[in-house]
Regions:
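Bacterial signal peptide processing site
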Residues: 26-28
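C-terminal motif of bacterial Sec signal peptides marking the signal peptidase cleavage site
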Residues: 21-24
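Von Willebrand factor A/integrin I-like adhesion domains
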Residues: 186-221
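Von Willebrand factor
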Residues: 31-141, 143-145, 178-181, 214-218
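Bacterial N-terminal signal peptides that target proteins for export
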Residues: 2-14
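Exposed acidic/Ser/Thr-rich ligand/metal-binding surfaces
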Residues: 33, 117-167
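VWA/integrin I-like adhesion module and closely mimicked acidic/polar interface patches used
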Residues: 151-196
Length: 221
């Protein structure tokens, strides 16, 4: 092989290596996190809303620059961006991200102070809105946190049955799932309610769990 041919072959190998490196970089999975927290404001559960602030502050403390978060209410009709109380994607600069977190916490605190009970509970609509948000952000890790008793109660005219819910790559965590008065008479209602939501999430390809002890959030995020 002549010196010219050897040099040309070496250049081709360098070009191939560069192309492969670029392809590898382009297909890398994002490492950031997206969190969507749903807060049930319906009926008597509205009295629990103050506890949600603890969860939100914990989430803010765990999230890093380039992570995204949104907090939205569950009420009569939850499949709408109007239900989003606050949302943010944190700046790469830590000082700016901390300013964003403080502003976010302030908006949440205002919501908690002013919230009023909703007559109905559209959990499925809230989940659909959450999935839209997380899909748009396209983060590497996706979490939906639901602060609710998980009892769906739809107003007349709201259709939510058999809606396709794609939970692939999403962790869904139900928090502070309080027991209804009827659950005390028949605990099977509580257990079957949670089992139905677990089945819906897992059938959609997601992962489901329940955390009722708000003092043990170490495994969250």
């Amino acid at each position: 092989m002549t010196r010219a041919n050897s040099l040309a072959s070496h250049c081709r190998w360098l070009m191939l290596a560069a192309v492969l490196a670029l392809g590898s970089c382009g297909s890398a999975t994002p490492r950031n996190t997206g969190v969507y927290l749903l807060v049930d404001t319906s009926g008597t559960y509205n009295k629990q809303v103050g506890k949600a602030e603890q969860i939100i502050r914990y989430a803010l403390s765990r999230l890093q620059p380039a992570d995204s978060i949104a907090v939205a209410r569950i009420d009569t009709g939850s499949f709408t961006e109007k239900n989003i109380i606050a949302k943010a994607t944190f700046d790469e600069r830590p000082s700016t991200a901390n300013q964003q977190k403080r502003a976010f916490a302030g908006r949440v605190e205002k919501f908690i102070d002013e919230t009023t009970p909703a007559p109905y509970t559209d959990i499925t609509g809230g989940l659909l809105q959450a999935l839209e948000f997380l899909k748009e952000k396209d983060t590497g890790r996706k979490e939906i946190l639901i602060f609710s008793d998980m009892k769906e109660d739809l107003a007349k005219g709201y259709v939510r049955a058999e809606l396709p819910l794609d939970f692939r790559g999403v962790d869904v965590v139900a928090l502070n799932v309080t027991k209804l008065r009827s659950d005390n008479f028949d605990p099977r209602e509580y257990l079957s309610r949670l089992d139905a939501w677990r089945a819906k999430v897992e059938q959609g390809g997601g992962h489901w769990r329940v955390i009722n002890d708000l003092d043990r959030l170490d495994g969250l995020l």
